[in-house]
Structure formats: C-alpha cells, structure tokens
Curated annotation (Swiss-Prot):
A cellular-component GO term for this protein: nucleolus
Family of this protein: Belongs to the PIH1 family. Kintoun subfamily.
Main subcellular location: cytoplasm
Record localization: Cytoplasm; Dynein axonemal particle
Role according to the record: Required for cytoplasmic pre-assembly of axonemal dyneins, thereby playing a central role in motility in cilia and flagella. Involved in pre-assembly of dynein arm complexes in the cytoplasm before intraflagellar transport loads them for the ciliary compartment.
Modified residues (Phosphoserine): S450, S632
GO terms of biological process kind: axonemal dynein complex assembly; cilium-dependent cell motility; epithelial cilium movement involved in extracellular fluid movement; establishment of left/right asymmetry; establishment of localization in cell; in utero embryonic development; inner dynein arm assembly; outer dynein arm assembly
Keyword presence, DNA-binding: no
Protein name: Protein kintoun
Basic and acidic residues bias (residue ranges): 416-430, 484-497, 670-691
Pfam families named among the record's database cross-references: PIH1, PIH1_CS
Bias (Low complexity) ranges: 352-371
Amino acid sequence: MAKEAASSPLEDLDLSGEEVQRLTSAFQDPEFRRMFSEYAEELTDPENRRRYEEEITALERERGVEVRFVHPEPGHVLRTSLDGTRRCFVNVCSNALVGAPSSQPGSGSAVSGRQWSLPYSLAPGREYAWGRGTRYTVYDVVFHPDAIALARRHERFRQMLDATALEAVEKQFGVKLDRRNAKTLKIKYKGTPDAAVLRTPLPGGAPARPEGEPESPFPDFPYPYRYPAAGASAAVPRPQAPSPPEAVRQPAPTEPRYSVVQRHHVDLQDYRCSRDSAPGTVPQELVVTIELPLLRSAEQAALEVTGKLLCLDSRKPDYRLRLSLPYPVDDSRGKAQFNKARRQLVVTLPVAPTASRPEPAASPEEAADPPGTDGAACASACRGEAGPAGVCAGDAISGPSRTRAADAGITTPDAPGKERVAKSEERDFGGQEISTTGTREEPPSGAGNSPGDRGGGALSTSWGDLDAGLSVGSASVRPTLGVEARETREGTGREPAYRAMGGPGTDRGEALCPPLQCSQDEESLTLLVQVPWILLQSLQGEVNPLWYKLSFSTQDLVYYSFFLQFTPENKLSTKEPEVSISSNNAVINLAKSPECHGYWREWYYGLNNYCLEERLFVNEDNVNEFLEEVLSPPFKQTLPLTPPLIEVLQVTDSKIEIHAKLQECSNSEQLHEKEERVHEGSPLTEKENTEHATISTTDSASSVAVTVLEADRCGSATCLQQGALDVSQKLFAESQQPKSEKEREFIKDKSAVYANERKDNLKEPVITEEKELDGNHPSSLLNKTAVRDTPGFDHIKETNMQDGSVQIIKDHVTHCSFSFQNNLLYDLD
C-alpha cells in the first residue's frame, strides 16, 4: 500500500498499488483528461446546480417535506483557532430565508435596554488544505440581511452578532473556539460557498397514493432523514424566554495546548545484567511542545524559563501560559524553535543535575561534649519534629560548628568561653516533658563550678533547684505545651526569639515566626507585628476564645505565621479583630471576652500550637513574684541575713531595673569569740591573721549597686527566675565577705611577706559591683572563695602514729586550688 509523504495532500487517500498505476496511466491519456475536465465543469455549472436543486425540491415534496436551499451571501469573516490545534474561519453571512431579528424591552432589570432575538442557520464545517499541506476548517453562520446591516452601523451590535455566531458553532458541533483571539478579517468570505438546506413538513402532510396505481414491488427509496410527525406542524416552536442580561466580561487570555515529553538518552550499558546498570529515573531533557495556531512568528511571543516554571506571553494573539515543570531545568542551555508550518513552539530544556548535600562529618569537638557546652535547639520543634508533648531536642554546639548553628537559627557566642548554650534538661511533670533552654557563664580555669561550691555560684547550681520554680511556667498548667525559656544577653550576638522558632535561618520554603509584642488593658490586647511591607490581601486570621492564629506574606514573598494561645480562664471575644497596617509594622487589636475583663498574667506564642513559648505581661503580680525570687536565696543559709533594701527603679516590657542594698550587720559576736581565743593562747591561722589585718580598712556594710536584669523580649518565666537566682547568689556572697575579714592581734615574723601580699589582695574598702546579665564578662563572684564556719565540724582529731596520742585541732584552714563538693571531704585532709 503506497502513501505519499506526510505533507502531501494525498496522505489520506487509501490507494493500492494497482489503483495508483491505473490512475497514472489514465491521466497520461489526453482523451481521459478532456472527459475529466468536462465532468468538473458540469459540476460547477450554475445552471446544472439550479436544475439539481429543483429536482431535489420536487422529490422532497412528494414525501410531504418542503426543502429550501439557503445560499450564503458574503458578510465578514472571523479568524480563530479550533480546539487549540488548527486554524478556523467563521463566515458570518446573510440570506432572506432566515428569520429577521426582533427585539423587545428588557424586564426585571434596573437598567433600561432591549432583548434581541437573532435567528440563524448553520452549515456543517468544511475542511480545506493550504498549499503547504496544513488544514483549516470553515463554518457558515447565516443571519437575516437586516442583522448584517445593523452590525455594519453599530459596533456593539456587531460584537453581539459575532459572539452569537461563535457560541452557535461551539454548541452545535461540540468544538472549542478561541474567543479571546477572534479577529475580523478584511475579506468577506472564506472558501467555496455551499448552500444549506431548510426542511419543514408541509401542512397537509404527504400526498396520498392514487387509487388505481398498483403498489411497487420494490421497497421505498432509503431516506436519510425521518419523516416529521403529523402533529409536529401544528406545534410552532416558540423562542425561549431570554435570560436576564449579564455583565459582559472580557475573556481571559487563552491558555494554549501543550505537551511535555521526557527525553532520555539510551545507553546499552544501562541494560547489562549487573547491579550497577539501571536506567536513570530522571530524564536528560524536557521537550515542551506548545500549539500556537494563530501565531505567525516567534517575534510575537515572549518566553521565559526559571527553575521549574515556564512562562509564555503573547499580546497579538493573546496567549498566556504558566507551566510548572516536573524537574528543575538549566535555562542557560535550553533552546526554542518555532515551526511555522505547524504553528508549534518546541522548547528543549536540559534537566539540571541534582546537587547532593553531603552530611558534614562530626568533629571531635562536636562528638565529645565538654561540660557546660551542651546546646539545645527548639527550632526543630517548630518544624514539626517535636513529639506530642512538644519536647525540643538539639545537638551540641561548639566553636567550629558555628556556621551550621547559624543555619539552624541557634544563637552562638561571639567570644568563646564567655557564653555557652546550656543543655536542655527534660523533667517529668505529671507524665509530660518540658524542655528548658538557657545560657550560662563559664567560670575561668581554677574556679569551682560544682553544685556544692557556694562561693562561685554559677547557673548550673540552680538547675537542680528549679523544680519548684518551673511550676510558674506552662508545664504544670498546660502539659501539652513545649516551653522554651531563654536568657538573651546583650553584646553577645543577640538573636530574637523568632529566629529560634523558624526565623530567617530556617529553610526558604517554610513559614517564619514574626517578632511580636503584646500589651494589654482591661478590655483588649494590642499585638505589634514588627514586619515591614505586609500585604493586606494576604492576611488570613482565625479567632477562637482560647487562641488566635494569623498568617500573611510580604512584598518580598516571605511567608509568616504565628499562633497565640491563652489559659482557660482567659478568653477572647470572637468578634473580628481590628487590623492596621503601615509600611513598617502591623497593629492588631483583639477584644477580651466580657467575663474575662481585667489584667491577664501570661500568654503563649509560637509558630504553631506544637511549639509555644510562655510570655508574661508586665503587671504588679508578676513584678512582685520576681522580687520574691530575688529576696529568697536558692539554698539554706547558715547565718541569718538582714533583709536588704529593695528599690524598684524601672519596670518595662523588656527590662526590670532594681537597686538592692544590704543593711549594716554587726559582727561583734564573731569578733568577741576571736578575742577570747587569742587571750586564751590558741594560735590564729595565717588566714585569720590576714583577715584581721584588712578589717580596719574595710567597712562593715557592703552594698550591691544597681542590678539590671535584661530579660528576653519574650518575658519568659524562667528568664525571671534565672535572674532572681543570680541576684540571690550575689547578695549571699557579698554578705559572707565581711565575715571572712576579722581582726587579728599579731603576725609572725616568718610570714610577714606572705601576709602583706594577702593583705593587698583581700583589701576591699567598699564592695560595689555593677553587673548586667549579658554574658560578656566572667562573674567576679567565681574568683572569690568565702571561708565559713561549718557547724558540726569545729575541730579535727589528729592521731600520732608513733605514740598513739590524739591532738585536737580547733582552728584549721586549708588552702587548695580546687573546691570541695561536699563538706565531709574536710575529714580526709
């Protein structure tokens, strides 16, 4: 079976080899060519066409059907596309046999107007071929000549006529035409005119057979159409009631048809019987074929490829395509080619190689966690890695791993050894776990930092005593919340709380938690979202009596989201919040429920309800609770302290500034005991002699200057507690200092030089310190060792191994470079 080339007009002819040979030899005969030409002229002769129509009309009347041939008269031509694959032309023609247009005043509308009825006649589509082998389709829509005349005078009537013609073709033949890019051509008719047929039944029906005529032995001639019913002539079709007029909407740009083909380069090595031979699942190239039947050249279109998105825009004709590609491509090596014959744009895009991310090997500093340098990161919980109890876990962070910690949104110290991230400790509260994260100062080498070292009380000494203090947080009241308590210190690369909760250090595709400040009055809450350039149309909020959720985006296409939650006794009103947006921030006003008016104590904030952080309002109750923590020491004292004088200087949302001054305490009893021992003849130790030498230049009252607790912006309860513990330890250490400096009466000659050196070191006229909890400087308290009288160990028994005599030593002081963790270790000296 022979076929021509694909571009040949004869590609659809199904001819055998014998038929092709016979046609070839016949057209070589001049006589056959003359007869074939006469046959073609007879078919196109108008007179023969008229005689054909008369015979068809007479034959149809014998069956009781009236046939009328509708010859289209040229009007104007619309060019569009058919199903997005080929060109299509619609001839808007006229004929007097079609009903005339009519109109009536519009009803049921506030705008006065008229409703038009436009009868039309349709002819089946005809296919034609271009000289290059491409095909197009032509449809004829015939109206009354009056409708064409009105369309020539009124532009809006012409638009309505064209829209009616396109809609009629789509509904009748089930095709899709491109209305957006329909264009009126200058020609009046496209293709060869072909008459349509109007068939209507005669009023009297089919004529009866004559009485004397015998019946034909042959069956009736097969007829392609059913004869209309007898009662059909009586039922005159009435036009349907016109639908109410709708606002004419400009159609959107047309989305062209496209196909995406994944192309692989076949290599026989990938099909060997071996484990390492397997064809890759990722293709080498993506071939995108876009059908643009109305596009003449590639200059009329703009193509842009970025990553996994292909964008195509064209004005005339109006095309718009936004195609999401299955794989990221390398747009720098892509190529596009426009096929004018098929009106196709073929885009070939190489697939970008996937960049594998090797996991960084754990360094020895990271593998072996030194004491006091363990870190805890709560950012993983904000990304959904926390369990049902909201437990936050993190890896250890050291100096070499600062880059990885910055990517995870974890605060790292600027100077090593000044500030370290404390290890997260998980404690059991009623079957639930919470995670507390804080920072602490690392003591210098040689200073004791053990829990028993009272003189150098670092933060590690208070972690074991926080069981009662943590009840202030949300663990005991709200066991399902993951509490993250932080101490943010100035000057050490301060990181906002939202960075650890999914801030700019997180992945690009995830939502970020914005910085937020919350203030209150008795009837409402005011939220200040410190994010610039917020898009108003992107705000999506939801209000519940116990929580409030909001998500939005900025002009930089950064997505933010946060979640607020309150305790069951504090409820919000469900009315719509008031939102005010400026170029720098956004202010949201939430109303409190009428039965919950007043000042609230706490609120919970985070990226979602699985990672919430407790924050406290600045009110009188919270300040009083903080002052109580300052006054109460973290451990039991051996000697009663005179209550210090507390003066609150400043209370703000981010800072609490107080002045604590110790009152004068009399050491007459201690001095009296020393005097008695000296007069009795008991020798004084070298330490006591030194202390006595310095007592004359030391005032009996010590004061702690202004202590500023720079709380985290979140105002978490654990931050306040940790600051209270530091102040308490500091007050206790200062109260013990005058006790260690007691009077002396004599000094031995052999230790004069050593005593003078100790005297210079221990001489402190007025101990005045000013410290902020910022982690920049090592605590001066860690460099001091307070010598105290230990009850129950006022003497030591020493046995002589030679004669077995026992010597009782009442005053015994040992100098060492380390600190004992337990007082019982004195017996081993």
